[in-house]
Amino acid sequence: MIKLAIALAADSAASITTPTGPKVFNTANKLFALSKFAPVGLLVYNAPEINGVPLEVIVKEYREHIGRKRFQTLKEYVDSFSSFLQDGPPMGKESQEINFGGLVHFGLRQVYLRAVRIRRHDETPSHDFNVYLRRAVDELVKVAKRRGRLKAFEDIDAEKVWKERRQLLSKLHEIVIEQFKEEHEIPDLPGKLRKDIEMAAILVVFSKGRLAGYTGIVIAGYGDKEYFPSYVQYETDGFTPYGLRCTDADMSTISHTNGAELGAFAQREMTQRHLEQ
């Protein structure tokens, strides 16, 4: 990005998270015009979809929605696109429920994976796996509190969420237990430990920190009243019944004192390698 122009570039590889693990596609489209009538583009990295809907489809719908309308600043384009996502039909209640279930499943797996790692490094391992689950819960809760809540979830009562979603949480928990039983001996869980594991998973979802299946978005270009280009970058895990799981937007702008900038997203080591050549 310089005073005269901004360029976006991406490879064609994209990944999505599935119940059996991540899958990589090597023919994904990652660059889109956000408007047909204004110099504003969108780049997507990592997962090319939000709530299971491909970004390519969402952007096409947004272009139809915005038509010939133009904005004075790039930030207004970002806000307009975010509002469209929030109100658009593809992000309805069913989609939000499914996405929340996927995020909680990830959080539950983090508890069990951490317990496995703790036992692996224990010089005098216990035969009771629940000992390690308890330690994993305590550690993850501390991590979540240290990171703090994402903005959308700051005022959400995790205890209330657990009560509202007990049936879903129990079902997902059993799925995770069965997955880990294939390689590990998982004893019956005391009621309090079971609840604490599920509460820890909720806190993982609500706290700041990158999850595996995130979608990275970069919106770049000019507003009608802007002389220099800028870009806004953020990462999202999609919509849930409690709000959008999304990082704070990070904006970079060219100015009289900042004449050039190079931004790298996802695999930053590729950019570093390019600069060293």
Task: Report the location of each language-model feature.
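N-terminal nucleophile
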Residues: M1-Q277
